[in-house]
Amino acid sequence: MPSLPLSGVPAEHAPGLPPVARRFCRYVRVDTTSDPASDATPSTDRQLDLCRMLVEELREIGLADAEMDATGVVYATVPGTAPDAPVVALAAHVDTSPDAPGAGVRPLVHPAWDGRPFALPGDPAVVFDPATDADLADAVGHDLITSDGTTLLGSDDKAGVAVIVQLAADLLRADAEAQVAGHPPLPRPTLRLLFTPDEEIGRGADPVDLARLGADVAYTLDGSGVDRLNAETFNAAEAVVTVEGVGVHPGYAKDVMVNALRVAAAVVAALPADEAPETTEGPDGYVHPHTLTGEAERATLRVLLRDFTDAGLERRRALVRQAAADAQAAFPGSVVTVEITESYRNMRAHIDAVDPRAVTVALDAARAMGFEMALEPVRGGTDGARLSERGLPTPNVFTGGHRFHSRAEWNTVQNLERALAYTHALVHAWADHGDRRSPPRRP
């Protein structure tokens, strides 16, 4: 098979990039990989490098109250011009997934991509082909942004970070121009900006001080594709299966050794293959054994559990417990224990109970731009799931990216601009539709 052409211009040499794309390419170069094995907050110090950069840039554009707290969470305020409007928070996470390399990201631009397959220069095995990635068909003619193939790109969620900071800069510049021209600024609510570490490992929203944030409604900018709103997530839990075997010299192990790795493998084998991530889609949940560590004497298996319904998640908990019990019975002398912890809940019920305007105003903003927003459940989680559970309704807005958590991750200049334009419309829609004097329902 002939090799594919290599493609990509280093972003720093790509002419004519708009400010939001330049900002995005600058942010993705900062290594912010989080670490699920760390008990620190944040889990990695490298995330603080981008947090400090954000504080500095936010202050430079005029947000004097920009500040990072002791947990790495960054807060800032864009003053509003419609005093009766609700306070709206815009949130994004700074960390990138540990599922793919995140250090040394080199963003490449592929100008006016013609739709023909290509490979990345850092690793020609990373291929972009509409035949294997259907979403690429919508990007023909766009200026693609990728990594060089040796790392992920970091669009999840530095695209959201870039859009929010660029939005703030745009609004403040428009205010200054209106003042010079002697015109009143366009009405908008007060905006609270929020940037969190450790979202990728399920801890992003926990350190957020909701009283300090002071928002009535919020949006995470952490969604894939374009023109999509997520107001429903999985219910999520993680099962930690610990296997105690019996260790002995392998030369004298007959009828004595109980190999913990084989026991753990039996647990994995007992999980239904038709309920795995690679065999499910749409409304289906899944059971995902994602990490196995250990040796013959002791092993630890981590299993992600996901379902859109409470009953479905409980059934998956039972599947893991039964698989563990069966494995222990099949390997006499082994001890298999299961500990299951909840990660986040489906946010739709919390949004509807507290303030359903979080969804309706977002849909109205799209209509004002001339399109219908696709309201889709997200097959994953966001900081918004936990924030919604804590009482702050927080749907998730698109940022243009695709193939998250992989070295084939991509976005486009046009998608970033679309996300920025929509976020402008969303902010101003709250001045038209929201009224803080009419308090939302509380659970």
Where in the sequence are the language-model features?
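Fold-independent oxyanion-binding glycine-rich loops
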Residues: V30, T71, A92-V94, D148-T150, ...
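Midchain, well-structured core segments that form catalytic/ion-binding scaffolds
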Residues: L136, H142-S155, R173, H183-P185, ...
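N-terminal capping segment at the start of a domain
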Residues: P2-S7, A11, L17-D45, L144-T146, ...
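Structural motif
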Residues: P86-A89, D143-L144, L191-R192, D216-Y219, ...
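Metal-dependent amide/peptide-bond hydrolase catalytic core
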Residues: P2-G8, A260-P443
